[in-house]
Regions:
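Alpha-helical scaffold segments that flank or form the walls of functional sites
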Residues: 2-61, 85-99
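A structural motif
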Residues: 39, 61, 131, 192-193
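Active-site glycine- and acidic-residue-rich loops that bind
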Residues: 43-46, 106-122, 203-206, 270-272
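His/Asp/Glu-enriched, well-ordered alpha-helical/loop segment
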Residues: 164-171, 211-295
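A conserved active-site cap/scaffold subdomain adjacent to cofactor or substrate pockets
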Residues: 180-183, 189-221
Length: 298
């Protein structure tokens, strides 16, 4: 997939049309959809974060708010420059970050290909200052990786460049990772960073699939996401189990427990919430939804 196509079809025009009212409605509908399909905690990477927080808080869902920051494009609906975006994220952390209650706030740069390195560095410093997660889309599109490798050829390629800059750490949560090769997966395993697998979108939007069996073999913590609020974790678990049985790679097949673990403890660990949620045991939050399996569409 080409970045220009992605920008025009899923980010620039659609995001630019959003109003506070429509974003509130989308956020609320997404939360209801998540609850309907058994999900009690959602991470929301979003523009207009104050509006998104209001909807998430009203819905009653446990949430991780991740105000979106980028520097290579500006939106009519959220026209912040990169310095203002950092200040907005800081404000959200100071006003909304309260994991013991229900809401966490993560520091979110949209992707490495649409953020200046000043913004990347400032975002990581902010995450370290407030001891919260640093999250980003990562190695999702072939076209983006090829362009980045060309840009940082003298530094050993893009992955080597970003590793040297210290952007991948134990507080990093990397969305997708679907273009990561074996040596890069091994390097990430040594940092303690987590990867969030999104099998639906990898297949439909990117035409690829993260090498999850190799990630797990190397000890990377893998969480599971649906990427879009209109999708659901149940379908993502099913797809995660199926797709890795048929990918033509040396490491194939996942244990049947792996998708469930990724959707629960894997995701909780990724966001530093595994002492509070992710499993049913004494002392943890009782985030429980019951589902009638006779009626469930999954």
């Amino acid at each position: 997939s080409h970045i220009s196509d992605h920008m025009l079809t899923t980010i620039h025009d659609p995001y630019g049309w959003l109003t506070q009212e429509s974003l509130y409605d989308i956020t609320m509908t997404s939360a209801i959809n998540a609850l309907k399909h058994g999900t009690t905690t959602v991470e929301n990477s979003t523009i207009l974060p104050d509006t998104a927080y209001e909807a998430m808080d009203t819905s009653g869902i446990r949430g991780i708010l991740a105000p979106q920051m980028a520097s290579s494009f500006r939106l009519d609906s959220d026209p912040l420059n990169w310095k203002q975006a950092l200040e907005k994220t800081k404000s959200c952390i100071e006003h909304y970050h309260n994991p013991k209650r229900r809401m966490s706030v993560a520091v979110h740069i949209h992707d490495l290909w649409d953020c200046m390195e000043k913004l990347m560095d400032g975002a990581l410093e902010l995450a370290e200052q407030y001891d919260t997660r640093f999250v980003t889309h990562f190695w999702e599109f072939q076209n983006a990786v090829e362009r980045a490798d060309e840009m940082w050829r003298d530094d050993g390629g893009a992955f080597s460049h970003y590793m040297k800059r210290g952007l991948i750490t134990s507080r990093s949560v990397l969305f997708h990772g679907s273009m990561l090769r074996e040596p890069e997966i091994e390097a990430i395993a040594g940092t303690g960073a987590s990867i969030i697998h999104n099998p639906d979108i990898n297949g439909t939007n990117c035409g690829n699939c993260a090498y999850v069996p190799y990630m797990l073999k190397n000890g990377i913590n893998v969480g599971l996401g649906s990427d879009y609020g209109s999708l659901d974790a149940m379908s993502a678990m099913k797809l995660m189990l199926i797709v890795h049985n048929i990918m033509p790679r040396a490491e194939r097949v996942l244990p049947y427990q792996a998708p469930f673990y990724a959707a629960t403890m894997g995701s909780a660990r990724a966001y530093g919430l595994d002492q509070e949620i992710g499993s049913i045991e004494p002392g943890k939050k009782a985030d429980i939804i019951t589902i009638d399996l006779k009626k469930a569409p999954h």
